[in-house]
């Protein structure tokens, strides 16, 4: 035997019917589906006001409340239709009514605003609601968002920015509203419909019902967001397309005209460096000029007399200016190694046959102070050290700034003449 349920007092039903049902046009009152929508409004009013102000009234759902109204006003069903059947038809019809709302994003585009229904088992979803007769979609979205959050999106809404899905044969369109300050105060305008309003990080929301991201990061099961789940992945895709969250841009959600982020600058620097390497593969333009100048200098010594004069001048310079040369060359070892490591661009075929000679360019002797590599025929030139005293040179002198490759090298004038074909 079923326990007897508490009944809604007749006076309460009279007041509710006069407020929401009896005053509607006759053509709507004769339509049971339209009457059910008005009964739904009466049910919300009963929960918001009568239940709050009159203790002892029974708590009832929409089906029990609709049965009580139809029983109290039998003229609403003149043909004696089955109430359960009418309610099923009304529920099916409701699923076909489009719903419109908004996805509200903060200024960082990383957080989204969700609302929670009043009932204890209600989950989190986007503010939205069913469209009224002859109501424009964007007007419906603005109205529903204002009723559920107290925030007016009319100044933010763009009619072309929305995500539209069909869920269980019901059309749902949510307009995307970016750039709402996170410190905005939200206050629902309807009673007993919205319990909580909170910001949630988009990356912590689930994309499907088995996504356990909110469980690990928010401590909430994914089914708590079942009304929002269908929109999360399309929202991420929309943000990626609109604000360029791709590897090509390197600047997150920055706009097209903003300053490139550091990775972009570094990428440009690396590109310029690679380009310079292609233009000057063997070094800087100055290095190229020096290397080009060296063979020209080598060709300039055209006869034996000029070579002898140059060698004598070299001897005199080393006697008088040894100290200055060492002081003016702070990086002698590095410089000497660099010069020695440069290959000769033009070699006489005789060099290939006489591998033991390994001739050295004349300008190397003049440009480096690495060794005393002058011929010692007839006289022994004296070279001045940094300390000021002279030392006799026999062709095998060693100085602190000498190159290892030429410490034991003896200058052979005859070999040089052969190489120059003089």
Swiss-Prot record:
The lineage of its organism: Eukaryota, Metazoa, Chordata, Craniata, Vertebrata. PANTHER family: M7GPPPN-MRNA HYDROLASE. A motif (Nudix box) lies at residues 129-150. Pfam families: DCP2, NUDIX. The modification Phosphoserine is found at residues 246-247, 249, 276, 284. Residues 249-258 have a biased composition (Low complexity). Decapping metalloenzyme that catalyzes the cleavage of the cap structure on mRNAs. Removes the 7-methyl guanine cap structure from mRNA molecules, yielding a 5'-phosphorylated mRNA fragment and 7m-GDP. Necessary for the degradation of mRNAs, both in normal mRNA turnover and in nonsense-mediated mRNA decay. Plays a role in replication-dependent histone mRNA degradation. Has higher activity towards mRNAs that lack a poly(A) tail. Has no activity towards a cap structure lacking an RNA moiety. Found in a mRNA decay complex with LSM1, LSM3, LSM4, EXOSC2, EXOSC4, EXOSC10, PARN, XRN1, CNOT6, UPF1, UPF2 and UPF3B. Forms a complex with DCP1A, EDC3, DDX6 and EDC4/HEDLS, within this complex directly interacts with EDC4/HEDLS. Interacts with DPC1B, UPF1, UPF2 and UPF3B. Associates with polysomes. Interacts (via N-terminus and C-terminus) with TRIM21 (via N-terminus and C-terminus). Interacts with LIMD1, WTIP and AJUBA. Interacts with DDX17 in an RNA-dependent manner. Interacts with ZC3HAV1. Interacts with APOBEC3G in an RNA-dependent manner. Interacts with ZFP36L1 (via N-terminus). Residues 303-312 have a biased composition (Basic and acidic residues). The gene is Dcp2. GO terms for molecular function: 5'-(N(7)-methylguanosine 5'-triphospho)-[mRNA] hydrolase activity; 5'-3' RNA exonuclease activity; manganese ion binding; telomerase RNA binding. It comes from Mus musculus. This is m7GpppN-mRNA hydrolase.
């Amino acid at each position: 035997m079923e326990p007897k349920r508490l009944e809604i007092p007749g006076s309460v039903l009279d007041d509710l019917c006069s407020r929401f049902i009896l005053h509607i046009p006759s053509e709507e009152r004769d339509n049971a589906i339209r009457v059910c929508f008005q009964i739904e409004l009466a049910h919300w009013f009963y929960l918001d006001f009568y239940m709050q102000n009159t203790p002892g009234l029974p708590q009832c759902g929409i089906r029990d409340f609709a049965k009580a109204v139809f029983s109290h006003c039998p003229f609403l069903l003149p043909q004696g239709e089955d109430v359960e059947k009418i309610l099923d038809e009304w529920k099916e019809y409701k699923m076909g009514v489009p719903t419109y709302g908004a996805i509200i994003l903060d200024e960082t585009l990383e957080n989204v605003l969700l609302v929670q229904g009043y009932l204890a088992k209600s989950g989190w979803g986007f503010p939205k609601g069913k469209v009224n007769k002859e109501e424009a979609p964007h007007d419906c979205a603005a109205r529903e968002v204002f009723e559920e959050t107290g925030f007016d999106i009319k100044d933010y809404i763009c009619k072309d920015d929305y995500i539209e899905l069909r869920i269980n044969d019901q059309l749902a369109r949510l307009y995307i509203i970016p750039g709402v300050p996170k410190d905005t105060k939200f206050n629902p305008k309807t009673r007993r419909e919205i319990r909580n309003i909170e910001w949630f990080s988009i990356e912590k929301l689930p994309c499907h019902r088995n996504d356990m991201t909110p469980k690990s990061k928010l401590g909430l099961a994914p089914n708590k967001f079942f009304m929002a789940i269908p929109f999360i992945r399309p929202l991420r895709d929309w943000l990626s397309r609109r604000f360029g969250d791709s590897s090509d841009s390197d600047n997150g959600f920055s706009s097209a005209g903003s300053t490139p982020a550091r990775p972009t600058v570094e990428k440009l620097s690396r590109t310029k460096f690679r380009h310079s390497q292609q233009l000057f593969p063997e070094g800087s333009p100055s290095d190229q000029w020096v290397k080009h100048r060296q063979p020209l200098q080598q060709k300039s010594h055209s006869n034996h007399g000029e070579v002898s004069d140059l060698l004598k001048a070299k001897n005199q310079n080393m006697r008088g200016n040894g100290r200055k040369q060492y002081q003016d060359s702070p990086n002698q070892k590095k410089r000497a190694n660099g010069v020695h490591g440069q290959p000769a661009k033009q070699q006489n075929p005789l060099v290939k046959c006489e591998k033991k000679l390994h001739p050295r360019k004349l300008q190397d002797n003049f440009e480096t102070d690495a060794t005393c590599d002058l011929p010692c025929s007839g006289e022994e030139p004296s070279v001045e050290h940094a300390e000021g005293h002279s030392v006799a040179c026999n062709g095998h002198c060693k100085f602190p700034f000498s190159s290892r490759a030429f410490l034991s090298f003896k200058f052979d004038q005859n070999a040089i003449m052969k190489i120059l074909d003089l």
